[in-house]
């Protein structure tokens, strides 16, 4: 048995093309293109790559991208002042602060400073709260991107047992909400979970977001499972691998590759969120 590979690059391209068409339609109607502000603090190589990829995707889809690349010595006060200005800037629909931030800047304070209507990462407590009560607006990019991947391949989660390994605010927790919203029975595993293998082996759908290379052995995977590997880990030889042993393809029915699986969908969903925020702002201005 060999698993079908869920091609995130192909699906992300369809999403970006759809956003591009809607942006072109806006322009033909005399409306402006959505605007995204991207803020990078410090010179972390991985963060720089992520930011550049996001800017390229914006250009491809016709969005206006504005960047602020500040040194790591930038203060929390300075960043909060910039966010305040961007919150009031009517040409900016989305504000993205690339994480992680330097230790002297509190990420939660920064996230909460972004207006919920411009929180295109979907991290603000307001937007997480709306997802919790089944009234989502701007949804966390990676979890929602994962759901769109499954939907594209007509993989229903309704009634399935979904296991998430990793309970971060960015992926694990909102992923559990997305799966619950779609009708799955969800289990969230974390560092205090006893007997992780037992939980993983019962998963019809396994989502991993741990950040440890090959953390989940292939023989833990339930035959016929759907494996969504969010982890992106660099090995000593420079290659990238996920949280799940690649040999899981011999057991699972569907797997997302690393790279080329979830990553492209995160960026595509960011563009979708920015367009949605722009449309929300337009409706607000009209009303």
From Swiss-Prot:
Query: Matching InterPro entries, A to Z?
Result: Aminoacid_DH-like_N_sf (IPR046346), NAD(P)-bd_dom_sf (IPR036291), THF_DH/CycHdrlase (IPR000672), THF_DH/CycHdrlase_cat_dom (IPR020630), THF_DH/CycHdrlase_CS (IPR020867), THF_DH/CycHdrlase_NAD-bd_dom (IPR020631)
Q: Which residues form the signal peptide?
A: none
Show the PROSITE patterns listed in the entry.
THF_DHG_CYH_1 (PS00766), THF_DHG_CYH_2 (PS00767)
> What pathway does this protein act in?
One-carbon metabolism; tetrahydrofolate interconversion
Q: What is its EC number?
A: 1.5.1.5, 3.5.4.9
What is its quaternary makeup?
Homodimer.
- Kindly provide the name given to this protein in its UniProt entry: Bifunctional protein FolD 2
**Which species is the source of this protein?**
Hydrogenovibrio crunogenus (strain DSM 25203 / XCL-2)
Gene assigned in the entry: folD2
